């Protein structure tokens, strides 16, 4: 492609609301153009990136035996009502009515459409397993669209849905998709980790996120320094915490503890380590048609992980409870404990199960129990509630967990029966009995990947694309268009590189050399060949964008050098 015939409107001005490098450089480089809140046009460079990523995703999904389909972007609201998500999903789901007052949605995800596609048509276990995918436009009405392509309202996504007769088959497909995703992100040149994750609004029993490590990452992930264990903080686990500190010596005795409302005050009052105290966190749980006060209990030197807590009580949302709401529920703020607690729902962290010699509130102002055994509660009271921290012990190998920042680029789920049961989608098993499908779903943020690549690889001058996925593998810059020999050599090199199957940009614009170099640094293609005065001595300059490393190469050798680097 000749730059003189190309459209890449670069600018020095960053978007006013941009804070992340990907947002700044993709707009400044003319990859995308913002046309509204969270809405972007893809210009030629952006569309080239979108197509290249799509090609890799499609090739690997096809190789895994997944069948491509295309769902309508607009989905019937009736399908979402059948699944139960029409009202539950929240304002992110854009709902609208047609002229006949029928409900429709702009799809942020397509579980309902996928179930409707097979319901009544896939009728026998002999037709299973089945895995279908699409690469299509999605819409999510984000409350605060920001960060450019990382948090837009309209986006391109690859979403796949699998249907199975049994759990073993569902697990095999889940593992196949995990391996397929790893191939995709490896081909795209990304430094990523597959991490255990919360299933969120999609639902299901098990999920993994694929996180690209980046210092500007929006998610906190914990990775073991000794094995492959990694998890989002919302789902992270650890080996059970222990302590060598002496335990309090008492036998479920009630003590007067005036004004000891905090864990620190209680530990100081009894001169014990906070490890032996139990902390109460009181929240208001919001459900579809009601709300109530819920108490969560964790170890005194731990913190509550709110996503885990929300999953434990099945709430749509957890918010802080006011003092009046706490009192109205019959709870005593600062002195709340699980022993003898009644009238409210409560949950206890798994690590406290069976613990002895603990200190907790006595549900009476200015009183605590000492020497409590956390063993007399029903199993359903115990949930994973703790917020795992850096330095905690890996649950797999005993190594230490380290905190990293990551950006989610993919998510795979074992959905189970959630959607098929709700929507009445069944098949006949080997015994002729009707059973709901087991399902999996698998998503990749295709347009988001463009921004993620920039976040993972850039400097203060612009993008630094990896050769595995870039709009152009190299750029040839003619420093002086009046130099006929230079123009002739550059044009011949351009044609030879294209004949090798490379995507090359020939900068033949009538612009100052400084403008051309600034654009090269901003656009970030892996290599630039500068055809200038050195040509008189039989030399050209090769610049590697990553680090802006410069080297002089004989003009007769530049083709073979680039062939070695890029082919």
From Swiss-Prot:
PROSITE patterns assigned to the protein according to its UniProt record, in alphabetical order: AA_TRNA_LIGASE_II
Domain of life per record: Bacteria
Pfam family, one: HGTP_anticodon
Subcellular location as annotated: Cytoplasm
SS bond list: none
InterPro entries documented for this protein: aa-tRNA-synt_IIb (IPR002314), aa-tRNA-synth_II (IPR006195), aa-tRNA-synth_II/BPL/LPL (IPR045864), Anticodon-bd (IPR004154), Anticodon-bd_dom_sf (IPR036621), Pro-tRNA-ligase_IIa (IPR002316), Pro-tRNA-synth_IIa_bac-type (IPR004500), Pro-tRNA-Synthase_IIa_type1 (IPR023717)
Keyword field contains RNA-binding: no
Location (main, coarse): cytoplasm
CDD domains cross-referenced by the UniProt entry: ProRS-INS (cd04334), ProRS_anticodon_short (cd00861), ProRS_core_prok (cd00779)
Listed EC numbers: 6.1.1.15
MF terms (GO), sorted A to Z: aminoacyl-tRNA deacylase activity; ATP binding; proline-tRNA ligase activity
Quaternary state and interactors: Homodimer.
Primary role: Catalyzes the attachment of proline to tRNA(Pro) in a two-step reaction: proline is first activated by ATP to form Pro-AMP and then transferred to the acceptor end of tRNA(Pro). As ProRS can inadvertently accommodate and process non-cognate amino acids such as alanine and cysteine, to avoid such errors it has two additional distinct editing activities against alanine. One activity is designated as 'pretransfer' editing and involves the tRNA(Pro)-independent hydrolysis of activated Ala-AMP.
Membership in a protein family: Belongs to the class-II aminoacyl-tRNA synthetase family. ProS type 1 subfamily.
Protein name stated in the entry: Proline--tRNA ligase
Species name: Campylobacter curvus (strain 525.92)
Gene of this entry: proS
